[in-house]
Amino acid sequence: MGFITKAIPIVLAALSTVNGAKILEAGPHAETIPNKYIVVMKREVSDEAFSAHTTWLSQNLNRRVMRRSGSSKAMAGMQDKYSLGGIFRAYSGEFDDAMIKDISSHDDVDYIEPDFVVRTSTNGTNLTRQDNVPSWGLARVSSKKAGGTTYYYDSSAGKGVTAYVIDTGIDINHEDFRGRAKWGKNFVDDMDEDCNGHGTHVAGTVGGTKYGLAKGVSLVAVKVLDCEGSGSNSGVIKGMEWAMREASGGGNGTAKAAGKAVMNMSLGGPRSQASNQAAKAISDAGIFMAVAAGNENMDAQHSSPASEPSVCTVAASTEDDGKADFSNYGQLVDVYAPGKDITSLKPGGSTDTLSGTSMASPHVCGLGAYLIGLGKQGGPGLCDTIKEMAHDAIQRPGEGTTSKLIYNGSGK
């Protein structure tokens, strides 16, 4: 069950400071990627200064290659650059210790963070009704009482809203999507398909015709995790950057365009300042983001992007309104949503039943799309709307944790 494979939550600590730039150290249980780092620039650094820095970096690396002895391994250097909303500029790549020391001494650098493995988070009026729902979560979202079998929803059903699913990809040809899913971008391998199944399951809960909350939403696959359900933090951030630009009209859009978009991240890893900063940039751009709280049965403050306050962090509930035993908790959890034994789509035209905060988060993403379709204001403030609509239902939610369970306002 999810976060489907566990990610070990840790807190990054400052390893050293050289001329003000922190080199962060991952905790002892993080699956760090050897010699891979994310370098984050100071917020005030301009595009021109960022370009000058990367030019300096390339020149420095070239000099090192020329001086390198035949026995030492050549590092790949900078591999990706990031710019989210003009407030988060960074790059990632492969660097040796000497190069990292040089980078850390550069005045424009804010901090350097080791790259690590990130994994899936799987352990009204005019109402339409869907009877005998295939997954209990649908009925629970539209009723203030547990045990129902009907999903009540407005026929607008999220039409005109686009949901970006940052995950393992989506089987866009699954019949339950009825042509509303499309491929976006792949940041992890050369297979534009969901070879894991996690992303298709998540997308089905967001917007499947039979299995989804927002049955009219458009879905976009942003693949950042591989067939095993894992990927690098740097690759995930690259996917976040792409989705943000697309949601904002290719980087030249308006807040209105962004307000018609939602994102889901049913994944996570150790607490990451870079990941949280990227998530905040997306929220600041006026885009609603639902994020899985994590499945370690501990405080969500230790996981990213769940620990970023500007996103909507979702814990998992059971069919009898309890806290799922695996679900993370804590003050950073915004709401609970159904997350145990959730049936949704599986690549190849079939279905699967999975558990995890990975399954809870898309209920909130789908609800967000549904509410925008009804005319509610999008963006990060939508999480406050969802919390206001939610009702106290969760028994023993965890220390310092809300007992609010999501509700779509059907009146049932």
Curated annotation (Swiss-Prot):
Which parts of the sequence belong to the Peptidase S8 domain? 135-412
List, for all copies, the residue spans of the domain called Inhibitor I9.
36-120
Q: What is its main location?
A: secreted
Q: What is its EC number?
A: 3.4.21.-
Thylakoid keyword on record: no
* Main EC class the enzyme belongs to: hydrolase
Q: Which residues does the propeptide include?
A: 21-126
- Glycosylation: residue positions: N123, N126, N252, N264, N408
Signal peptide span: 1-20
Q: Which locations, inside or outside the cell, does it occupy?
A: Secreted
| Family named by the database record | Belongs to the peptidase S8 family.
Provide the function of this protein: Secreted subtilisin-like serine protease with keratinolytic activity that contributes to pathogenicity.
Task: From the Swiss-Prot or TrEMBL record, give the protein name.
Answer: Subtilisin-like protease 6
For this protein's source organism, the top of the classification is: Eukaryota, Fungi, Dikarya, Ascomycota, Pezizomycotina
Q: Which gene encodes it?
A: SUB6
